[in-house]
Amino acid sequence: YEFVNSFQLRNEAGALVPYQIVSIRRNQMRQFQWNVFRRYDVYRVAFRTKLRAAGWTTLRLEPSPDFVRSYRTMRTSQRSATNGILRLDFHPEGTFDVTDLRSGRSFRNWNEFRFDREIGDGWNHVEPIGNAALLCSSESSLRVTLDGPERTTFEITRRYRLPASLRYEGGLGENYVGIRESEEFAEVAIRTMVTLDRDSDQLGLHFAIENHAEDFRLQLIAPTGIPGNCFAGQNFAILNRKAGRELGDATEGGFEREFIEKNISGLIGKRDASGGV
């Protein structure tokens, strides 16, 4: 068994605010006043409220004489959940679909990754001749790490097995032969935390990578199914950009080729008259 305090949250009007306990860190030393320290159990909770612009929002925590629990959940099956605005459907291979229930539009097969080799200069991507790309994971798993009426979090773990590095090989007489992948293999594990909040049209995504390989480029694949241009954040502006290469194949014979990837400042997406992502 585990000891859990019973308490309530109330807003400024005195109304109860539903919450969900996310985690408890026990026996934590915290500064109470000046050089006075006390030992606490630190509760991390999830709840929904409104924050005033250029002001503050007050919540009151008070002990509860009754047990505080909820049997409600946003999950609709083993591998799906909805908050009435968005619906999530997870697949055994480690991808998931997002459906906007307001428009009925679905964005499918998210959480795909692509590995290929990298011999660039740190500024531009350059691939070696005979560049091989790894497109599928060798193992995937799905866990529900948080399940309640306010927040539901799924954790996807995908493991990729790829050659550990590139080798610059020599031949007889120490002549340089070329670049090839090593015969030793290494594993790259990618954990994706997908968080769905009550009454929210935003999906929380957090990625954690455990890497034991080198000399590769990792790309996140997020298909939208929306044709046309994209928009990208830049300093003090949102720019419309052509999907793919702006110049098409015009730089095939040039000294410096045009790269598909362009720099962005924290925002990129696609949209049409029905919305976007």
Regions found by a protein language model. Name each.
Residues 3-5, 222-277:
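Polysaccharide-binding surfaces and accessory modules of carbohydrate-active proteins
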